[in-house]
């Protein structure tokens, strides 16, 4: 996983000022991952759709272009492609999988159905350890997923590698700075894949590694100050890392011009309310208004078991509560002769990509953590994290001096524990789940696993009664489900292989300390087919 330790911290300045690396998305499931890997190499990257006209692509002044994989076959009618002007532009281009085939096909190479499709782990023979394959061993373990192969490279290209099913598995035309590879260097199953990407960026395209947390902060602080001037700003804190880092970054830029609102809906994990009210404020000095609305939320949720209805009630209740606090902020600012003009949101780059948004989006995007903010708020948006992935946000939080407990907090849904109780939400059930969840998080942290696991939802099957024996007595309790998952972006996930001794400790503690729980079970399902959250 990308982490602050992996972000280069030796160079200030920011490569996006000199033009980004553009990742052209042909519908690949790994397109965002390619962009992340470029960032890990210390170079700023952006995703663009393959349908973007080539003149618009080149108008962005890209310093390099990467063509992603995709599900199509290049020789089928209507298959997505790219204008050959890209290859004639002088900009270094790397084609990956389908993007590699597009490059070969459009430049006159021979592409056809593979005699042998290759899926999964595949050994590649390196014919020339140069360019993108500089310093490569004679054989590489790679990750393939193709039923179409480049059988002959276009004129001017040198074959760098082959596999049993791909006569041309990697190629290069150094004179035009064009490169292609059939396997997926962006996935962890290609152990030397990151080295290939770094070779392309630093050796072939001669790009510096100047995308780092310090330069991002410096750049954003300058932009925020220019945007805000002497106006005042409001930010809704959800308790999650995104809104916390966004608020800390804006506060670094404008100080007391920022007021944060934290709505305690009573559905947070153990200690989180205190963490926001005390630790976050102590670390940042931010002015915070806390609204204790726990009883209001519980009253609104009484008797409700259906998951979508829970979400809707929580979202609507949050909006109404935030609006009330917002009026207080506006009145206080008015009394000082000030005007609140801006709203901070912790929008991340995946949110922008998945919503099809671009620069300068005017409408307020529904906040994925809190169920949506009022659509009629007359504020201008400040979204200081909208070019960043989650792990870059963590790096910035660390650089800003936020406590690890906030920066490394596991992702948590806006409806909170409300959608981790299968059944009606009551105060007693919330208290029970809160204790069990705290035990699981504490033991995972003790075992040093809290940064290896993306998140570990703890789910209370409140409407299920499990037979048990506790203290020589027959009991009917509720089962608890542990759902530890590993992921890079939450779009896909695998269940985490938590050591048995850690699981045993968690199970023993929960059943001993939470007497209404007599069974702990492990959810070992990947996403897909299952989602990370149960509701």
From Swiss-Prot:
The keyword Ligase applies. The active site is at 97 (nucleophile), 184, 186. Its EC number is 6.3.5.2. ATP binds at residues 238-244. GO terms for molecular function: ATP binding; GMP synthase activity. It catalyses: XMP + L-glutamine + ATP + H2O = GMP + L-glutamate + AMP + diphosphate + 2 H(+). Residues 20-210 form the Glutamine amidotransferase type-1 domain. The keyword ATP-binding applies. Residues 211-409 form the GMPS ATP-PPase domain. It is an enzyme of class 6 (ligase). It comes from the Bacteria. Keywords: ATP-binding, Glutamine amidotransferase, GMP biosynthesis, Ligase, Nucleotide-binding, Purine biosynthesis. Pathway: Purine metabolism; GMP biosynthesis; GMP from XMP (L-Gln route): step 1/1. HAMAP family: GMP_synthase (MF_00344). Catalyzes the synthesis of GMP from XMP. Homodimer. This is GMP synthase [glutamine-hydrolyzing].
């Amino acid at each position: 996983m990308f982490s602050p330790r992996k972000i280069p911290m030796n160079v200030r300045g920011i490569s996006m000022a000199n033009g980004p690396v553009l990742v052209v998305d042909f519908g690949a499931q790994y397109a965002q991952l390619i962009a992340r890997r470029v960032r890990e190499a210390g170079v700023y990257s952006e995703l663009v759709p393959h349908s973007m006209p080539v003149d618009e692509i080149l108008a962005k002044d890209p310093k390099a272009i990467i063509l992603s994989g995709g599900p199509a076959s290049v020789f089928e009618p209507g298959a997505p492609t790219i204008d050959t002007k890209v290859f004639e532009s002088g900009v270094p281009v790397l084609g990956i999988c389908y993007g590699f085939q597009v490059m070969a096909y459009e430049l006159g190479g021979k592409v056809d159905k593979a005699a042998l499709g290759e899926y999964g782990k595949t050994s590649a023979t390196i014919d020339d350890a140069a360019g993108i394959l500089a310093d490569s061993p004679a054989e590489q373990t790679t990750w393939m997923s193709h039923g179409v192969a480049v059988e002959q490279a276009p004129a001017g290209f040198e074959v760098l590698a082959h596999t049993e099913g791909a006569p041309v598995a990697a190629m290069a035309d150094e004179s035009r700075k064009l490169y292609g590879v059939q396997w997926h260097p962006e996935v962890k199953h290609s152990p030397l894949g990151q080295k290939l990407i770094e070779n392309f960026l630093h050796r072939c395209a001669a790009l510096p590694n100047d995308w780092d947390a310090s330069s991002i902060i410096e750049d954003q602080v300058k932009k925020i100050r220019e945007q805000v001037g002497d106006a005042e700003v409001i930010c809704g804190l959800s308790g999650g890392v995104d809104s916390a880092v966004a608020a800390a970054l804006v506060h670094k830029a404008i100080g007391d011009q920022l007021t944060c609102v934290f709505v305690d809906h009573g559905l947070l994990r153990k200690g989180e309310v205190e963490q926001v009210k005390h630790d976050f404020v102590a670390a940042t000095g931010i002015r915070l208004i806390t609204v204790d609305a726990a009883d209001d939320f519980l009253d609104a949720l009484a008797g409700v078991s259906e998951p979508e209805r829970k979400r809707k009630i929580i979202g609507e209740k949050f909006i109404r509560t935030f609006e009330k606090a917002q009026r207080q902020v506006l009145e206080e600012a008015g009394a000082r002769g000030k005007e609140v003009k801006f709203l901070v949101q912790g929008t991340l780059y995946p949110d922008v990509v998945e919503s099809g948004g671009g620069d300068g989006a005017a409408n307020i995007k529904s906040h994925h953590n809190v169920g949506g903010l009022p659509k009629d708020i007359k504020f201008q948006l400040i979204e200081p994290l909208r070019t960043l992935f989650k792990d870059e946000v963590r790096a910035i939080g660390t650089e800003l001096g936020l406590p690890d407990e906030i920066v490394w907090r596991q992702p948590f849904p806006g409806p909170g524990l409300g959608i981790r109780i299968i059944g009606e939400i009551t105060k007693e059930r919330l208290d029970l789940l809160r204790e069990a969840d705290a035990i699981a998080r504490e033991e995972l942290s003790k075992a040093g696993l809290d940064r290896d696991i993306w998140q570990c939802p703890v789910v209370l099957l409140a409407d299920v009664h499990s037979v048990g024996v506790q203290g020589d007595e027959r009991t009917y309790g509720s089962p608890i489900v542990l759902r530890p998952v590993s992921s890079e972006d939450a779009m896909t996930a695998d269940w985490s292989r938590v050591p048995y001794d850690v699981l045993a400790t968690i199970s023993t503690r929960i059943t001993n300390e939470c007497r209404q729980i007599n069974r702990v079970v492990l959810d070992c399902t990947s996403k897909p087919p299952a989602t990370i959250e149960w509701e």
